[in-house]
Amino acid sequence: MGYFITFEGIEGSGKTTQIGLLGEQLESLGYSVVMTREPGGCAISDKIRSILLDADNSSISPMTELLLYAAARAQHVSEVIIPALKQGNIVLCDRFSDATLAYQGSGRGIAREKVDTLNQLACQSLRPDLTVLIDCDVSVGLERARRRIETASGPREERFELEALEFHRSVREAYLELAHAEPQRFITVDGSGGVEEISEAIVAQVLQNRLNNTSHALL
């Protein structure tokens, strides 16, 4: 079995950039790495992603949103993540089940037990071995996210960026609470620094504190 690392953070935290940098670093050290994302990661889940992130779909109810995320995750786990882990890869995933607890649980106010039940079903009880939380101020993150959207080509995936500041503050607080509750699984990194500085902090902690001391064989 491989090793499963997830990246979490609010909009504009820089996790997508950092997951790519960690992947490159691990590959340079000889590890076999699969990088993926949620929502999405495979053809069916990418179609669900287009619904979830399209700002024109602002009328999606919280429960519909939760169920769509669960459906996308169920397909992604079955088609991509579990097969990659069985092949012995390190899987790096941009968002996973913690995002649902933060966004749909805390942000949307859906009861924790409902989110937990759907997460367990969609994940087939799979849990990350390690989660990297990149934390940053909400205003800073949203400004970064909006700049990215304005310069990106393709569909404008901005439904969550258009939410009120209070929504994003609730999501950030939920992430910090999750990290506090499971310090053995979470690495929390300050996302306010430069890209290289953040990358060095993540690589150092992943390699020195986790991979070298884990019971998982990463050969």
UniProtKB/Swiss-Prot annotation:
GO terms for cellular component: cytosol. It holds the Pfam family Thymidylate_kin. Its EC number is 2.7.4.9. It is an enzyme of class 2 (transferase). One of its GO terms (molecular function) is dTMP kinase activity. Keywords: ATP-binding, Kinase, Nucleotide biosynthesis, Nucleotide-binding, Transferase. It catalyses: dTMP + ATP = dTDP + ADP. Phosphorylation of dTMP to form dTDP in both de novo and salvage pathways of dTTP synthesis. This is Thymidylate kinase. It comes from Pelobacter propionicus (strain DSM 2379 / NBRC 103807 / OttBd1).
